[in-house]
Swiss-Prot record:
This is Translation initiation factor IF-3. It comes from Chlorobium phaeobacteroides (strain DSM 266 / SMG 266 / 2430). GO terms for cellular component: cytoplasm. It is found in: Cytoplasm. InterPro entries: T_IF-3_C_sf, T_IF-3_N_sf, Translation_initiation_fac_3, Translation_initiation_fac_3_C, Translation_initiation_fac_3_N. Monomer. Its main location: cytoplasm. The keyword Protein biosynthesis applies. GO terms for biological process: ribosome disassembly. The gene is infC. IF-3 binds to the 30S ribosomal subunit and shifts the equilibrium between 70S ribosomes and their 50S and 30S subunits in favor of the free subunits, thus enhancing the availability of 30S subunits on which protein synthesis initiation begins. Belongs to the IF-3 family.
Amino acid sequence: MKKQKTTTQKPKLSYRINEQIRVPEVRIIFPDGTQQVMKTIDAKRLAEEKNFDLIEVQPNADPPVCKLDNLGKLIYKMDKRDKDLKKKQKTTTLKELRFHPNTDKHDFDFKTAHLEEFLRKGNRVRATIVFLGRSIIYKDRGLELAERLTERLSCVSNRDGDPKFEGKKLFVYFEPDKKKVDAFERIKAKTGVPQQPLAPLPPSEDIEE
């Protein structure tokens, strides 16, 4: 029994399909990726013979580009992609740790290790350098610290823009880089040395947004 075409289905996409396509000719993209320019009437006939929908995906091209595909499946793929994207956005958290322009090496290493771990887990991070009292006169130290952070975290992230002063605070943002993280994890795995869990941060230090 021949499968019923989906021309009566109300599409969620803004594409023209089947009889809605009225241009003289179109460029067809076949399921195997090959392409061919043909008269629209022939393309519609071909779609019907192969039990596909003719879906216009690039209306402004010359000639317009159409795909031979099942509209229902295409909508499902688009919906799944959107849901996966929303899910990923929901699980991404902005984590923040605070530093001072005179942060000592031990504190710097400890907090930077936590920032690195946050990034490896896919979180954005913000390093906030706080200038207390008259320490604001040492802005250059804050900027130097921002560069040290950038260098230290470059193995798993990219800095998002330049460090930005707001009042007596200097903000530095970092975005996780999946390729860098994957490469970092591979190198870690090759060492064969089990990674020890980090000591927990004080409650006042672990900030989420």
